[in-house]
């Protein structure tokens, strides 16, 4: 099981390496994944844990997958145009130290982070619980409890010129925001390593 999870070995490689049948490998992997899934905390439990923290970090990550050979473009939902890879979108909830609190069920990789968080009810549950959320700019306009970095205003539609640069104060706020959000990337790294 560890060889499957850690190295991504195929069932055929596992069967050959351990000298067991392919059906046995399939059964062992399914049983182990079912046990791990049963041990995972629910969103309700995760929000209860988050309520006891000063803030939580929400971030989405793309877990790469092999391209599935589907005809007729049925694999398109799994292709992330942002990352130029096939994968699944997983929402991650982490504490201020970067420890994993909760991960969402996987959605197709083409799904935007905020759309995925809304589909799982993550943002609504955190807002209802009054939890302060630190997130990246993908979660802009999510809700009042979600803090995102300032962004430079868009171009003026009439002249095409940038309206203004970020002020020194806005840059300082963005820098502090990035320091708070940084440990959340560690939680994402735990999923990928």
PLM features: residue spans?
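Short, well-ordered secondary-structure "scaffold" segments embedded in the functional core
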Residues: 13, 17-27, 34-37, 41-193
């Amino acid at each position: 099981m560890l060889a499957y999870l850690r190295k991504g070995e195929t069932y055929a490689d596992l069967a050959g390496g351990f000298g067991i049948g392919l059906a046995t490998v399939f059964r062992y992997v399914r049983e182990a994944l079912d046990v791990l899934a049963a041990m995972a905390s629910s969103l309700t439990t995760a929000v209860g844990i988050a309520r006891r923290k000063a803030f939580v970090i929400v971030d989405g990550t793309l877990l790469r997958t092999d391209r599935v050979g589907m005809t007729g473009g049925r694999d398109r939902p799994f292709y992330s145009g942002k990352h130029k890879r096939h994968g699944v979108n997983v929402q991650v909830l982490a504490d201020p130290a970067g420890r994993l609190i909760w991960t969402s069920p996987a959605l197709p990789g083409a799904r935007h982070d905020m759309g995925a968080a809304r589909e799982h009810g993550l943002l609504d549950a955190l807002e209802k619980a009054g939890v302060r959320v630190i997130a990246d700019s993908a979660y802009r306009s999510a809700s009042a409890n979600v803090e995102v970095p300032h962004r430079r205003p868009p171009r003026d539609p009439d002249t095409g010129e940038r309206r203004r640069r970020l002020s020194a104060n806005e840059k300082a706020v963005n820098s502090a925001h990035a320091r708070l959000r940084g440990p959340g990337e560690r939680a994402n790294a735990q999923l990928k390593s």
